[in-house]
Amino acid sequence: MNSVLSHRLMRPLAAAFVGVITPLAFAPYQFWPLALLSPFILLLLLHQQSAKRAALIAYLWGIGQFAVGISWVHVSIDTFGGMPKIASLFLMTLLVGYLALYPSLFGWLLNRLFPNNSRSKWLCAAPALWLITDWLRGWVMTGFPWLWLGYSQIDSPLANFAPIGGVELITLLLLFCAGSLAYAVLNRRWLMACIPLVVYATGYGLQAMQWVTPQTERTASLALIQGNIEQGLKWLPSQRWPTIMKYTDLTRENWDADVIIWPEAAIPAFEYEISSFLHNLDAAARMNQSAVITGIINQSDDKQYFNSVLTVGDTPHGEYRYDLTQRYHKYHLLPFGEFVPFEEILRPLAPFFNLPMSSFSQGAYVQPNLIAKGFAFVTALCYEIIFNEQVRDNVTPDTDFLLTLSNDAWFGRSIGPLQHMEIARMRALELGKPLIRATNNGVTAVTDERGRIMAQLPQFETGVLKATVTPTRGSTPYFLWGTTPLYLWVGLAAGFAFWRQRRAR
């Protein structure tokens, strides 16, 4: 292999190619074995390279992965950013280049701290360092934990580890398997190549575990409204009431549902502007013994703006009244979409930095469950569903469902909304709670507590998804402990590998 890769450009080019094909492991392609093959090849390419060289190789792997895997971001920048194509491509290049720094850091740390070809390097250090750099990517500058390798395994046997340690545990196991294969190939210890078989077989066996129990005596009939409102028209004043009446008409046909759910910011107006309409909607819902959950925009007395969710109809609060303390307010805001860092500098530069509804304030990190028709919903608005610890910290023993409202119309007919749905499915599996996802134009769907899609609407069509969903009782290990055991393992594994490295010297 070294002879094939002896030319100084071969390893970086090979890494870039492997990075490019890595997104095929994720939705909509879901060729999940690539999520094991890709880091395995990357580890081989890093072998016997200087730390500086390893950083370059891993950086190009990251460039390939993110240039393809998050290409959908450019759809939003190019379509709604109001800037020349060259400028939108430049911004996209900056984003991809930034995200690739994290794989680069992994490569540098691995070969700087562990230059030898040892078993502890491949089986302990590599998985630990990968997880550390993933965590950093999910935290720095509000975080962007998209394309974590574990998400690709939602339909593989490894998915059954999610209720134990979340998506991070799956990522850790992928790197553990990749490291064992790298060690086997580099040292001709072929027995080590059996480790992935054992790990996947264990995952398959875990399918029999029943972490939670369906409450068959309690079922909720739901109607999810997919309005399919064109993003370019959504915030035009002339389209406000046509949009609201479209959702109202679709709702009127489905008052037999326990809970009717509209998507994120389905009502393109501030709540205080349409209080009469909401009073009427509340009265109609209560008359039909139903409840409506909808996304809406709010403004507080001190002129702070919130991306909110409200419930009307059969709720514990009685008749509708304008009270912001009884709303869910989005906590994790999307940079440049819902708030603009350094806005005094950036907003004058281009329309992209001055999009509609891009001056929001944060809600609280932990908020009460929304109650509708006696069911408790943990809410995550759009981007928030990718932050697993935030969702987990809002779940209580009384939570019935995970609810995520979104508007992915920003990203057109790209792979982004399908990746988004894949991530949402993982939240259901981790926490053992059915997930309800209502969107403007897809993917609108309902999953069971194992993240399996039970019902789904076609994308880019107006429609109503009717489904009966059963809540669960009980707790998964991940709900009880979160990622704390993984933090401990990473610290111990990295420390052990470093100790072995020093001892070998």
From Swiss-Prot:
Gene designation: lnt
Species: Vibrio cholerae serotype O1 (strain ATCC 39315 / El Tor Inaba N16961)
Alphabetical UniProt keywords: Acyltransferase, Cell inner membrane, Cell membrane, Membrane, Transferase, Transmembrane, Transmembrane helix
An example Gene Ontology CC term for this record: plasma membrane
Family membership noted in the UniProt record: Belongs to the CN hydrolase family. Apolipoprotein N-acyltransferase subfamily.
Name under which the protein is recorded: Apolipoprotein N-acyltransferase
Residue ranges annotated for the CN hydrolase domain, each copy included: 225-471
Subcellular location: Cell inner membrane
Function: Catalyzes the phospholipid dependent N-acylation of the N-terminal cysteine of apolipoprotein, the last step in lipoprotein maturation.
GO biological process: lipoprotein biosynthetic process
Transmembrane segments: 15-46, 55-75, 89-109, 129-149, 161-181, 192-212, 479-499
Record NCBIfam families: lnt
EC code: 2.3.1.269
InterPro entries reported for this sequence: Apolipo_AcylTrfase (IPR004563), C-N_Hydrolase (IPR003010), C-N_Hydrolase_sf (IPR036526), LNT_N (IPR045378)
